[in-house]
Each structure stands twice: as structure tokens, then as C-alpha cells.
Amino acid sequence: MDMRKEQYESERPSAAFPFESRYVDVLGHRIHYIEEGRGAPVLFVHGNPTSSYLWRNVLPAVATDTRGRGIALDLPGFGRSGKLADGNYSLDLYYRVLEGFIENLGLKDLVLVLHDWGGPLGMMYAVRHRDNVKAVALMETFLWDTSWKDYGKFKTVFKLFRSPIGYLMIQVMNFFVNKILPGSVIRTENMTREVMDHYRQPFPTAASRKPVRVFPQLIPIEGRPETSRLFIEEIEDNLRRLDIPVLWIKATPGAIITSNTEYRLVALAARMPRLAVKEFGSGLHYLQEEDPRRLAELIAEWIKGQNLHNLPSETDNILFDAA
């Protein structure tokens, strides 16, 4: 057992969330966010059913190591951000809020760190605001119209999520938070009661869980829904114009990029010549709960390697480098 792994196993990642809560009004929505550090901004964007809490053990380390300003927001309906009275959550809403958040905080020359639904949302910002994004780090996300064959053993459950039964499963039973979230982490011992209580806290009622149900319905699968397909197509059509460093952090066995879907990543690399792939090691979907120290190291070392913050270069941008 190597020293890093031994140290990790002796120190379970902290469940604490010791950040000052900050709020900003974006398009009439009360958006919660956290930040730490000074310098060039590194913006962390979560997916379903998480929040800025997901980044609690990653953001401070990245901000310190890169001498940057780490920022993580909660999308509407998640974390401590406000919920929509009409429950009308949509991909367009989430994008406009992300775009407005960046504008309201005056964030310039961004590095984006994106997970799950944060991937399409952040990449849409990158292709529409190429002059304001310096680099993008991605993990366990998608930038393509998916296929049912991509889902493997989860095909049935995601079909149910997109059916009327999804209301019972996700909003009444809280299945996504209670089962999918902890079940998508290999190191289950990390998903302690305290951690799960943090993740459950924003969703005390069936109505409050509406955004958790909406995201599975929005996933572009074989061209549906059309709004999501068009959203993804705009990103795909502009990837070659995005002349910035892009990092993909790949876990084994992974959940979105697996041995059966790695062809997706190869196809993406063909469109993005500045894409680097770094191996995370053992993990499923929520890598932030697997080994946040490892994740922070990969992100920070890569950022420094691009010399974005005028720091000494320590890494090379090489496709499928198993650093």
C-alpha cells in the first residue's frame, strides 16, 4: 500500500461544511455560494442531487495550491439556494442562472471545474463566452446525446425516472438521494450519516425534491427531449473553436465513462486537440466523496501545468497521462 493511500484510509474525508454562506440575486433567484482564497477565479459547478457541499474538501485545497479564488454555487432548488414556487425547473433556467451568477460576481478569466450536469451547463458557458474562460476541468459528465445502451444496468431505473413512476421514486421516496447518491460511491464508508444528512437537508418534502426529478428527465437520450438535444448540439458544434486547455478526470470503473463507453471520450478527444485525460483511480460517479485529496491534487497540478496563474509549470498536457 502506498503512503498516499495509507494516509487517505486513515483519514476519512471531513463531513464538515465550514464556509461562510454568501448570497446573490440572479434573475430574481436567491443563489447561495461559498468562496475561499484570492486570485484568479476557479468556479466549481455541481450536478444532481448535490450542491456546493460536494466540493467542500476539494475547493479549499485547489484554491490554496493554485493561489486562486475557489467559488462554488448552488443551482436553483439545490443546497441553500432558493426553490422555484412554480417548480418550473429547466435547462435554460439553469444555464441563465449560471451565466448571470458569473456576470453578477464579475468573474473574469475563469477556470471551470464541472461535474455531472455542471458539465453541459459550464461548457455551454465556455462556448458562448470563449474570451472569459481560460480552462475547463471535467469529470463524470457528458457532452453528447446519450444512448440507452450507455446506461447498462441502470437503463431500467432511468427509464422509470423519466416515467410517471419517477414522481413516486424520486419525490415521494427520495430514492435518488437515499440510494443513487451513496450507491454511486465505491468507498461507502465515506457516506456517513452526517454526510447524508447534509445531502438530505435541502429536500425535506416531496415538493422540494422536484429539481432532483427534473434532471433525469432532461438528460439527452437518443434525441429526447428536443430542448436538451439542441442544447448539447450547440456545445458539440462549437468544441473545435474552443481553443483552451481541457482536462477530463477519469475514474475506474466510473459511471458515465466506463469500459463500455470510453469510445465517447475518444470521440471527444478527436474534436478537442487540447484535451488531456488524467486517471483518478478507483471510483464511480461522485469522485469528490471517494478521495477528495486525490481529486484536488489532479485539478491543482493540471491548472499549474497550464501556467494560467503564472505559476511554475509542473505537468504536461498529454492525452491519457496516468499521473
Question: What are the language-model segments listed below?
Answer:
Residues 40-46:
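Short beta-strand element of the alpha/beta-hydrolase
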